[in-house]
């Protein structure tokens, strides 16, 4: 390592000075010296147990639950019927628990939630991702459009039944006020309960943050991918949620209409950019870790992402400074032995190799640029710089025999590789470290942890 640093220091005189952008400290990674993690959150237990198909997740540096199950010690996802008494209307039109949050007992919900958390996550030292997937309604009145407008209508009727003497205008204002108050209490108190019971977990809501940049279907070549200003403003109003979250879980799912297109990168980039913005404003001591949800196949299909779109999703997420990416999948992945083999083939091909490429490159950059005390982040978020192994310097080798399969990365950084990293990336130091290259130990910052 010493000779690498000598070369690195010698190269400084040829490089531009640091661009002066302040980067908030990050929470230390979930696993030591693993600045970028890839999780598997798909129900593929049947592949292993029923069809005897090993997807080789660990071989390709993927963090998964025991037996590749949907929930476990690495990541647990709570759907509406898994946590408490979540009031909602499901996709089939069935009513649950009073439908709207102001028509259900919060105390009853929290008591049931406590029981559910103890049952689903029995390990008190749980250190994984705790993801609450409540998508039926949004806590902000103005965001309940389309099919979610039913929650506004129900809230108006609820207020009218309680206060028939009020004018229609006052009823609407009261309905909005009471709905948002109750929705906030349900979401906030549920989060705080989970964090109190399993304090070492990374807790947050799936699809928070969002930025509503879905207009690629109508804009075509005019699509910019940028989050509408009104949606960014609405995200600012959710500061109460960001402050009580310990992780953010935006999604970067690609529909097949975006396959290998410029619009795909625009879509993903701006969603991540908004998530990183929110992560930096949530707390004063460190930026929240961001774990982007992605799919290894295009949304609503069983067609694997192209190599270009692996870069668009996994590569972009790592380069933007996220803590990791979570691959979600449906029951289709494990529905038959053929579907399991299809996932395995993709894992042993482009998907697995690219994951090894990015996770290894992120570790190398953290080591040589940030002394393992921070993660590498693009200096300019809109650039096209990626954390990739340099093909002229590294090779990914897969070895397999009758008993095991392993991946080995061979190679070493050359001077020009170091120069590229220094020119295009900067360090986001973990708590307790500061300096341009996270070289300074800070007792003051450690005390905040």
UniProtKB/Swiss-Prot annotation:
The active site is at 135 (proton donor). Transmembrane segments: none annotated. It is found in: Secreted. It catalyses: Random hydrolysis of (1->4)-linkages between N-acetyl-beta-D-glucosamine and D-glucuronate residues in hyaluronate. Expressed by the venom gland. Monomer. Snake venom endo-hyaluronidase that degrades hyaluronan to smaller oligosaccharide fragments. In venom, it is not toxic by itself, but increases the diffusion of other venom proteins by degrading the extracellular matrix. In addition, it displays antiedematogenic activity. Belongs to the glycosyl hydrolase 56 family. This is Hyaluronidase-3. It comes from Cerastes cerastes.
């Amino acid at each position: 390592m010493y000779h690498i640093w000598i070369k690195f220091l010698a190269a400084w005189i040829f490089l531009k000075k640091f661009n002066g952008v302040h980067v908030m400290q990050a929470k230390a990674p979930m696993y030591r010296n693993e600045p970028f993690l890839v999780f598997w959150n798909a129900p593929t237990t049947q592949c292993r147990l029923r069809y005897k198909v090993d997807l080789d997740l660990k071989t390709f540096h993927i963090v998964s639950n025991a037996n590749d199950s949907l929930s476990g010690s690495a990541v647990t996802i709570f759907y509406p019927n898994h946590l408490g008494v979540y009031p909602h209307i499901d996709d089939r039109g069935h009513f649950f628990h009073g439908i709207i949050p102001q028509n259900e007992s919060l105390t009853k919900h929290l008591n049931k939630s406590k029981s559910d958390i103890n049952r689903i996550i029995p390990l008190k030292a749980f250190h994984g991702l705790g993801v609450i997937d409540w998508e039926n309604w949004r806590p902000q009145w103005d965001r309940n459009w389309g099919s979610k407008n039913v929650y506004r209508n129900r809230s108006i009727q609820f207020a009218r039944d309680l206060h028939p003497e009020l004018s229609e205008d006052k009823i609407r204002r009261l309905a909005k006020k009471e709905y948002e108050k109750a929705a906030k209490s349900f979401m906030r108190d549920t989060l705080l309960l989970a964090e109190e019971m399993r304090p070492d977990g990374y807790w947050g809501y799936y699809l928070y943050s969002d930025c509503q940049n879905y207009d690629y279907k109508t804009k075509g070549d005019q699509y910019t991918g940028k989050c509408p200003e009104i949606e960014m403003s609405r995200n600012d109003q959710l500061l109460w949620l960001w402050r009580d979250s310990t992780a953010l879980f935006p999604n970067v799912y690609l529909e097949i209409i975006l396959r290998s297109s410029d619009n795909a990168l625009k879509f993903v980039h701006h969603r991540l950019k908004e998530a990183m913005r929110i992560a930096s404003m949530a707390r004063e001591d460190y930026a929240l870790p961001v774990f982007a949800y992605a799919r290894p196949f295009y949304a609503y299909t069983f067609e694997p992402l192209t190599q270009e779109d692996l870069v668009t999703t996994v590569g972009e997420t790592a380069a933007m400074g996220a803590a990791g990416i979570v691959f979600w999948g449906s029951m289709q992945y494990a529905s038959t032995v053929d579907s399991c083999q299809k996932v395995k083939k993709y894992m042993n091909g482009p998907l697995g190799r690219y994951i090894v490429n990015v996770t290894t490159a992120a570790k190398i950059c953290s080591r040589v640029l940030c002394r393992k005390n921070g993660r590498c982040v693009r200096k300019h978020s809109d650039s096209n710089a990626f954390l990739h192994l340099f093909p002229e310097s590294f090779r990914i080798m897969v070895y397999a025999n009758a008993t095991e399969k392993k991946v080995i990365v061979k190679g070493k950084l050359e001077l020009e590789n170091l120069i590229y990293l220094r020119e295009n990336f900067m360090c986001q130091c973990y708590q307790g470290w500061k300096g341009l290259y996270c070289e300074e130990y800070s007792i003051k910052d450690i005390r905040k942890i």
